[in-house]
């Protein structure tokens, strides 16, 4: 990467809007990527720099570019909960169902680490609520792991399979049982979670309960 492109890339990464504009006017390539395949759009989207994202898109940034792990700008923005940036990227043509090398989508990232409004936005734009990553995990499983009841409700209302299993036969209810919060377990059961399902080792959800939580949870899971 030459000096102009390096200065442009660094400016985008730190949120220096004026410097970004200056470097583009001097010939910087808006789609230049670093050694990991990350572009200025990816960096600024993940860090929440709305004005830079808008400028880059207006000046030809590739909204579908992928880094060496096949991650996109939308995935980064969704993970960090940047709703307005997610909107800009989707409007510019970002694929809400693209997945990285591990099969993970923007919705999965938002369900685990992002914000309810981003989850709702992605669902509204057609994100597949039952997509699975390479380990068989779904967005609902991720939201369960993060104890995010609002996200879980949004996913279930959109048709997420409450009894989906990962590659080990583990369900969202089994994850909730291990985490140990009665409200989480009760919520899933009320939405159709089957406590009689077994994983591929023959374990029921109740077998995932840790010893210190068993007394509080056994009544819900028996």
Regions found by a protein language model. Give the residues of each.
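Conserved ankyrin/ankyrin-like repeat signature
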Residues: 19, 51-52, 84-85, 117-118, ...
């Amino acid at each position: 990467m030459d000096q102009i492109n390096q200065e442009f890339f660094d400016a985008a990464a730190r949120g220096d809007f004026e410097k970004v504009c200056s470097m583009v006017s001097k010939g910087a390539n808006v789609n230049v990527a670093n050694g990991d395949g990350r572009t200025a759009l990816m960096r600024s989207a993940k860090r929440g720099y709305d004005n830079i994202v808008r400028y880059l898109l207006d000046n030809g940034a590739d909204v579908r570019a992928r880094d060496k792990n096949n991650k996109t700008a939308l995935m980064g923005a969704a993970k960090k909960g940047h709703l307005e940036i997610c909107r800009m990227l989707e409007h510019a043509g970002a694929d809400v169902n693209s997945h990285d090398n591990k099969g993970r989508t923007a919705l999965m990232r938002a369900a685990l680490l992002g914000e309810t409004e981003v989850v709702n936005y992605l669902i509204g734009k057609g994100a597949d609520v039952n997509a699975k990553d390479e380990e068989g995990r779904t967005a609902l499983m991720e939201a369960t792991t993060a104890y995010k009841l609002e996200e879980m409700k949004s996913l279930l209302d959109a048709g997420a399979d409450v009894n989906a299993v990962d590659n080990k036969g583990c369900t969202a209810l089994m994850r909730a049982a291990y985490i140990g919060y009665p409200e989480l377990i009760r919520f899933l059961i009320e939405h159709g979670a089957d406590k009689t399902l077994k994983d591929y080792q023959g374990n029921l959800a109740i077998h995932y309960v840790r010893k210190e939580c068993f007394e509080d949870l056994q009544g819900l899971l028996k």
